[in-house]
Amino acid sequence: MNEEQRYRLRTPASGRFFEEARRHLPGGDSRSTLFYPPWPAVLDRGEGCRVWDLDGNRLLDFTGNHSILVHGYRHPAVTDAIHRQLDRGTCFPGPTEAQLALARHLVGRIASLELVRFTNSGTEAVMMALRAARRYTGRRLVAKLEGGFHGTAEDVMGSVHPDLVLLPAGDAEAAAGMLDRRREDIAALLVEPVQGSAGMIPLDAGFLHAMRDATRRLGIVLVFDEVVSLRVSHGGAQEHYGIRPDMTCLGKLIGGGLPLGAFGGRREIMALFDPSHGAPAIPHPGSYNANPVSLASGLATLELLTREAVAGLNRMGDRLRAELRRVFDEAGVSVAITGLGSLFGIHLTDRAVRTVRDAVESDAAMRHRIFLGLYNEGILLDPRGVGTLSTAIGEREVEQLLDALRRVLAQLGSPAAAGNA
């Protein structure tokens, strides 16, 4: 019996749910990245670092809902903050104390944020940051790096758009040259310091510093998309790399499991949104902007994510990446392990992975078999081979992941498994 057959036997309720959901939702869901064959498991509840599916299978979760839940599921301090705000109201037609509290925290925590505004997602944060860069510079084009994912806005989602200039990640000379040639047209360079969707690939520090130098020289607004990478240091990847961008976009974990995004940066750029002296240069309406329940959840989450907590996560991440390499090496499976801090990526390739171009060589079929095999062993990873740690995960849980991976690789390497592939 192969991995998929075992998965089908373990998740029949999810299979039935999926067939019913497809009658009402295209693909059975509203989030494309969650699909994998034969059907995605339907998760029913979570507690700490564990989730349960509809069939009652208990799994150790190494996704944190794709890096959002940095403290795991239902952390008491976070749920208490949510309940307190719910008792006061879910939304209001005016500013709230919750908004000021989280704004004050973020401005004090992240060096590049002189002023900040809130949105409902990282996608919206990127959209507003780019709108500001265009208005501030009077230019239209946006440059981004190969492999960077910045949400689902039309002009940055793909790699081909009339307003988009695509730069090679990792090649500082070529990227700077392309910026220089279009210097009169490029408003912003959008950078994901750790490229999450590409496979948790941290960009080279020298390359990032070169991009900071080039954008400063050319008058291009440097925008760091820290939706995923905020967790790698107390002040985000920008603190880790020692780079101060002009603007920063946030999302995912800053809502503590509820929808929230934020963007901010230099005072003179953010002043374009200020309506207190007349009509703002850039309007920023939104009925759910700065929702107080999300803000309360986010503040509780970030207050728990102290420097000490981040350091502990990063130490565990360093150890996990080293041990993952060891397990694959012992099994004779070629692998490149990427990541930074509490983020990790597994690439089934015999070449070093420094950019997305290296990552495309990964064996996708083998990766899927490992994913299903780990699910059958009670371990939940992202089907794309990436994962994150949470403060709810300890050394014992890391060992459980490593032991499960050893069993899966041993099964995949057996003659019977090869015949059932």
Regions found by a protein language model. Name each.
Residues 1-421:
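Conserved N-terminal phosphate-binding loop of PLP-dependent enzymes in the Aspartate aminotransferase
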